[in-house]
From Swiss-Prot:
UniProt xrefs under SMART domains: UBCc
Domain of life, per lineage: Eukaryota
Gene Ontology CC terms, in alphabetical order: nuclear envelope; nucleus
Coiled-coil annotated residue ranges, if any: none
Pfam families xref list: UQ_con (PF00179)
Gene source species: Caenorhabditis elegans
Residues of the UBC core domain: 4-157
Assembly with partners or alone: Interacts with brd-1 and rad-51. Interacts with smo-1 and sop-2. Interacts with bet-1 (via BROMO domain 2). Interacts with isoforms 1 and 2 of X-box-binding protein xbp-1.
GO biological process, alphabetically ordered: anterior/posterior pattern specification; embryo development ending in birth or egg hatching; negative regulation of transcription by RNA polymerase II; nematode larval development; nematode pharyngeal muscle development; protein sumoylation; regulation of protein localization
Protein name: SUMO-conjugating enzyme UBC9
Pathway in which the depicted protein is active: Protein modification; protein sumoylation
Active site: residue positions: C93
EC number: 2.3.2.-
Amino acid sequence: MSGIAAGRLAEERKHWRKDHPFGFIAKPVKNADGTLNLFNWECAIPGRKDTIWEGGLYRIRMLFKDDFPSTPPKCKFEPPLFHPNVYPSGTVCLSLLDENKDWKPSISIKQLLIGIQDLLNHPNIEDPAQAEAYQIYCQNRAEYEKRVKKEAVKYAAELVQKQMLE
């Protein structure tokens, strides 16, 4: 099944290089020998304009298994984000990434990253993954927004882009 996964991921890369949303980054990691590891992608999602996430660029790793696209990739913020739907490990809790819920093999990397960006500003409080962020989001929205704005400054787009290019 690995051949199918590798072929699909090569296509995803080709489509991404031709057309991707402004400010987003998605690229396979390079192996020590300079070849690309299509099963391990470094990505970054910009905070949407006019939201508390604006100004930040949030790094995320996508790990694909041999049975992709039958199963979704594992998406993990590195470092983990303060968000109700991000586990303390950084793993994203999103129905699109759950093969038993909304995952479909036709979903592209671009669609996933846009979906995760949308989740940042619209948490799903029915499916919390991080107790502290969930409680603060529900009980003290002003404090939650203050914490998120600090993260946006901490992960300023210019700094993260520079780190990813090194």
